[in-house]
């Protein structure tokens, strides 16, 4: 199968330093609506002018026959088409004196790793700034880059760094006049923002723990290789931000070979973007790599999930591949939905880059480009089904996928606290509330990272791991971190340890209610409910909050997800599990934040009373069913007086306790509840002048 790409073209080049690609009678990549986009081949080559280091794209094409019906396509597709490979008009807009950029440039700058924002707390004129997002495969951040990002936050941002759910930094509050300085500084200090946003492959996730284990190291190497394979090649990023200066990178030969291979019609021949072409992908594309049991990356929420499969000796042999996950949706549109990835097949380790490329090309050729709400890979999977998707992808792969190998149960792993890496060094995972590095915490991190020359890794749960620590440094590092409020996990409320929120207000343009600023109070209220209904301090529930339905903090995988649905209002989602393998469902369509207790108190009370042994809240809600849960809420009249717990501690020998616990479980109670009943009955009998048998 050969990819085709082209159109009748008029190009203004001559002496124009910013040539504009004008394509008429556009027909394009295949879509699920059966329209054809870019149906004729476009032969593109690059030419360089000594007076202008920026790449100039020239093209020739056979005149095309006008299409009978112009296929519908989104406005963003037109912006991409006319952009000279994501350059124009951004390269002009960043040079003028306006504080903002125009609509086309606003879409294009996403490919460069930035979003234009404004402070929504302010009234009157808009105060524009830009958010920059880095790209760090597997969350790896060299010492030098961390220190530079820390400096840039103070010099050009709002004084904070935001750790994201895709293992990257976000730097907020950069003014347009400072964009080029900030971007070029990141580029020249071992960093990049290229492809952190936009319609292309985003940051590739991998377990952040720097274990010196074969499977973990292989997963990280694979994430790096996939990221390199799918990095844009046309040079637009460096043309805009460092005036075309070449940045030398060393790519493994297997990456170069896989990218250039066109034996199965995956590439655009002679194009500066052999995989993406001028139109790139229909929408964002997310990939994660991990090892068996380690679901720290939320593997099933990605467009592609890749799992290392090893033999009995621990030697990596190949990969299970899962496809079609994604979180984003639109309120009150049932045709949009979150979705879990499903098994595609197994490939030997030497084929992984070709398999990933084949999946990406299948989405490129068939994903919808007319309506961006339905452009993610998950909608193609839902439309086609896995069998058709597998069959089409195999044509680009050139082989049959083998059945997925059986894997053990998944676990969520945070890697907080101190751990041995396995090479003689230690690493320390630090909890950062909502990923916001600021104040004393920021200062403490800077001090230890700079003093001990530490590299770091960012986690998919908005936390940070300090790497390469010698045993002798453990105590002084722990002391400095504690002074900055970075405590060991045993000193942090368990509810906070797994909670996540997106930034939302005041800077996110999509937010419709609070998330990061609202979650501290919500967690305190949940903790208070726990205390009222008798849940232990050590018990927890995975809580995730977003300010809109796009799902950046992955609320649809939470045991309790709050999804912004209006000012101070949320949808309530229930049914995710602690190991992130089940999709939550909508329990309440709209709930004012002040009414949270009316819903959560009866749910947590009945969870404590009716749960099975070690049953999580998510598993409990799934077992009960939403109809029964709705009854709990509707009939709730408050915590029964008999369930109130006063400061009474009971002690028993082990044999008595175990017998009591076994008896209590039969009666759907815990040992303490049964003991209280025994005491209550004894007291009542004494008051009535009766003796106990």
From Swiss-Prot:
Cited function: Essential protein with sulfite reductase activity required in assimilatory sulfate reduction pathway during both primary and secondary metabolism and thus involved in development and growth. DNA-binding protein that binds to both double-stranded and single-stranded DNA without significant sequence specificity to reversibly repress the transcriptional activity of chloroplast nucleoids by promoting DNA compaction and possibly regulate DNA replication.
Q: What is this protein called?
A: Sulfite reductase 1 [ferredoxin], chloroplastic
Family from the record: Belongs to the nitrite and sulfite reductase 4Fe-4S domain family.
Query: In the record's cofactor note, how is the cofactor described as bound?
Result: Binds 1 siroheme per subunit. Binds 1 [4Fe-4S] cluster per subunit.
- PROSITE patterns on file: NIR_SIR
What does the record give as cofactor? siroheme; [4Fe-4S] cluster
Supply the alphabetized keyword list.
4Fe-4S, Chloroplast, DNA-binding, Heme, Iron, Iron-sulfur, Metal-binding, Oxidoreductase, Plastid, Thioether bond, Transit peptide
EC number(s) for this protein? 1.8.7.1
Q: In which tissues is it expressed?
A: Expressed in leaves, stems, roots and petals.
**What is the top-level taxon of the source organism?**
Eukaryota
Native species = Nicotiana tabacum (Common tobacco)
Self-association state and partner proteins as the record states:
Monomer. Interacts with ferredoxin.
Where does the record place it? Plastid, Chloroplast stroma, Chloroplast nucleoid; Plastid, Chloroplast stroma; Plastid stroma
Which positions are annotated as binding [4Fe-4S] cluster? 502, 508, 548, 552
């Amino acid at each position: 199968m050969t990819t085709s790409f082209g159109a009748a073209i008029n190009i203004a080049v001559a002496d124009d330093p910013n040539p504009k690609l004008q394509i008429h009678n556009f027909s394009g990549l295949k879509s699920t609506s059966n329209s054809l986009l870019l149906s004729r081949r476009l032969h593109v080559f690059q030419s360089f002018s000594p007076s202008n280091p920026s790449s100039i794209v020239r093209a020739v094409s056979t005149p095309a026959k006008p299409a009978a019906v112009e296929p519908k396509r989104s406005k963003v597709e037109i912006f991409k088409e006319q952009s000279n490979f994501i350059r124009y008009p951004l390269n002009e807009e960043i040079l003028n004196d306006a504080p903002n950029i125009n609509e086309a440039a606003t879409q294009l700058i996403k490919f460069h790793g930035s979003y234009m924002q404004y402070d929504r707390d302010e009234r009157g004129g808009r105060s524009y700034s830009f958010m920059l997002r880095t790209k760090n495969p597997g969350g790896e951040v060299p010492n030098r880059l961390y220190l530079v990002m820390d400096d840039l936050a103070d010099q050009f941002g709002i004084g904070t760094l935001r750790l994201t759910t895709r293992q990257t930094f976000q730097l907020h509050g950069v003014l347009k006049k400072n964009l080029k300085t900030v971007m070029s500084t990141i580029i020249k200090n071992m960093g990049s923002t290229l492809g952190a946003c936009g319609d292309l492959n985003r940051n590739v996730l991998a377990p952040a723990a720097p274990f010196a284990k074969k499977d973990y190291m292989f997963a990280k190497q694979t994430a790096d290789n996939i990221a390199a394979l799918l990095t844009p090649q046309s040079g637009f990023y460096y043309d805009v931000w460092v005036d075309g200066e070449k940045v030398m990178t060393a790519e493994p030969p297997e990456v170069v070979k896989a990218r250039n291979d066109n034996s199965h019609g995956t590439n655009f021949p002679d194009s500066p973007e052999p995989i993406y072409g001028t139109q790139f992908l229909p929408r964002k594309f997310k990939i994660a790599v991990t090892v068996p049991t380690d679901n720290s990356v939320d593997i099933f929420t990605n467009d592609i999930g890749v799992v290392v499969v090893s033999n009995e000796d621990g030697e990596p042999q190949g990969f299970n591949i899962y496809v079609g996950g994604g979180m984003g949706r639109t309120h009150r549109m049932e045709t949009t939905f979150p979705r879990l990835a499903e098994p595609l097949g197994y490939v030997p380790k030497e084929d992984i880059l070709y398999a990933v490329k084949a999946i990406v090309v299948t989405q490129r050729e068939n994903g919808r480009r007319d309506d961006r709400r339905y452009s993610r890979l998950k909608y193609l999977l839902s439309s086609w089904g896995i069998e058709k998707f597998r069959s089409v992808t195999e044509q680009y792969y050139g082989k049959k996928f083998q059945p997925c190998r059986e894997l053990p149960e998944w676990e969520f792993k945070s890697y907080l606290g101190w751990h041995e890496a396995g090479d003689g060094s230690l690493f320390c995972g630090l909890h950062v509330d909502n990923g916001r590095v600021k104040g004393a915490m920021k200062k403490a991190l800077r001090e230890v990272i700079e003093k001990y020359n530490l590299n770091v890794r960012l986690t998919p749960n908005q936390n940070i791991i300090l790497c390469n620590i010698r045993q002798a440094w453990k105590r002084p590092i722990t002391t400095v971190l504690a002074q900055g409020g970075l405590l060991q996990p045993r000193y942090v409320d368990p509810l906070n340890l797994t909670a996540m929120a997106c930034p939302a207000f005041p800077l996110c343009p999509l937010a419709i209610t609070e998330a990061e600023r609202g979650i501290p109070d919500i967690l305190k209220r949940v903790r208070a409910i726990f205390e009222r209904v008798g849940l232990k301090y050590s018990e927890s529930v995975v809580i995730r909050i977003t300010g809109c339905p796009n799902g950046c903090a992955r609320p649809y995988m939470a045991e309790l997800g709050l999804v912004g649905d209006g000012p101070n209002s949320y949808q309530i989602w229930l049914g995710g599990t602690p190991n992130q393998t089940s999709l939550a469902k909508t329990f309440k369509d709209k709930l004012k934040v002040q009414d949270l207790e009316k819903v959560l108190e009866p749910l947590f009370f009945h969870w404590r009373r009716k749960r099975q042994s070690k049953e999580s809240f998510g598993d409990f809600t799934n077992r009960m069913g939403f109809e029964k849960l709705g009854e709990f809420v509707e009939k709730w009249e408050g915590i029964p007086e008999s369930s109130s717990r006063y400061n009474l501690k009971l002690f028993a020998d082990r044999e008595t306790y175990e017998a009591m616990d076994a008896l209590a479980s039969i009666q759907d109670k815990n040992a303490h509840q049964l003991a209280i009943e025994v005491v209550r009955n004894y007291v009542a009998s004494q008051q009535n002048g009766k003796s106990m048998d």
